[in-house]
């Protein structure tokens, strides 16, 4: 794998962790909608690390999600629950950003942050097993 791809993977994983950390900070400050957005972007950016491994990218979120489902869920490289986590996070994030009067509770935001942490960990472990993780 070209070094620039490894660097991109590393960068995207670092960005995903930073976004997850931001989600936790926002959750603690009771900014639940913004926390949900950061949780989604932690997952989305982690998936983009996988795409960097494969040498592909998409300009739209739906393209990234579809690729993940096709190449990583349907091939059973990841459990189906991760497809659900990502799809639901995308939908909830859209609602928090664009829907009027969309109410988010602490529990909603906590669940999304927990799922994002699990999701990111799964991707990091996968990349490490592929000998592509951050320490490579």
Give, region by region, the residue ranges found by the protein language model:
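Terminal alpha-helical segments
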Residues: 1-136
